Amino acid sequence: MSKIRILVGVKRTLDYMLKPRINATKTAVDLSGQKMSINPFCDIAVEEAIRMKETLKNRIEDTLVVTAGQTSSEPILRQCLAKGIGRAALINVGEKELEPLSVAKLLKATVEKEKSNLVLLGKQAIDDDAHQTGGMLAAMLGWPQFTSASKVRIEGDKVIVTREIDGGEETLSSTLPAIITTDLRLNVPRFANLAKVMKARKAPLGKMSPEDLGVTIDQRLQTVSVSEPVQKRQNIMVKSVDEMVKTLKELGAL
């Protein structure tokens, strides 16, 4: 049986408990002063990598978590280290806007550099819901891809993944190397204790740039506008039945 080198891709997003607000120019979500966290789907991927490390033990040669962004993304990397990931690295892209294709290119170069043979990714990010990075990375590497995994098993060099589909479940298998994108049903991420959090604050982080990886970042898409969902329900208070009937007629409901 071959050794397993796991790479987990993660993304920094607006905390899922917060309601997004649109900036003044209506071209993006305003992140100024907002709490940022690890994308929940990425957190599932991190947890699964740690569980593999715990259960497969000597077979896991390396666990590496990678994110592409600015130095402001370092806290989520340290969070992953505190939970049990072995190493963490930041691909510093500065102020550049990243599209899924650029992220896939950066991950491909990192996979090849680190000789990873199992990649875990969240199936989507809650900010753009693109669902694209995993598929693009699989195509670039020529690896099999398991999407929206709700159960994962590794038996020898075989990866067995169950995913939920309409009205049931589908189980697929392939051999390493492979890419898995994770669904929220796969596991429940752990919390790191204070001692591990403090230790992770002092842990070294790998630093790379797109140039180090031989990747050129091109922006092919331009955001034209961003808007909040249209309010479909109106709350109208009435004082009597007659007023209610009148209001319903005015709205065309009667």
Curated annotation (Swiss-Prot):
The keyword Mitochondrion applies. SUPFAM superfamilies: Adenine nucleotide alpha hydrolases-like. Its cofactor is FAD; AMP. CDD domains: ETF_beta. GO terms for cellular component: mitochondrial matrix; mitochondrion. GO terms for biological process: fatty acid beta-oxidation using acyl-CoA dehydrogenase. SMART domains: ETF. Keywords: Electron transport, FAD, Flavoprotein, Mitochondrion, Transport. It is found in: Mitochondrion matrix. Binds 1 FAD per dimer. Binds 1 AMP per subunit. GO terms for molecular function: electron transfer activity. InterPro entries: ET-Flavoprotein_bsu_CS, ETF_a/b_N, ETF_b, ETF_beta_N, Rossmann-like_a/b/a_fold. Signal peptide: none annotated. Heterodimer of an alpha and a beta subunit. Belongs to the ETF beta-subunit/FixA family. The electron transfer flavoprotein serves as a specific electron acceptor for several dehydrogenases, including five acyl-CoA dehydrogenases, glutaryl-CoA and sarcosine dehydrogenase. It transfers the electrons to the main mitochondrial respiratory chain via ETF-ubiquinone oxidoreductase (ETF dehydrogenase). This is Probable electron transfer flavoprotein subunit beta. It comes from Schizosaccharomyces pombe (strain 972 / ATCC 24843) (Fission yeast).
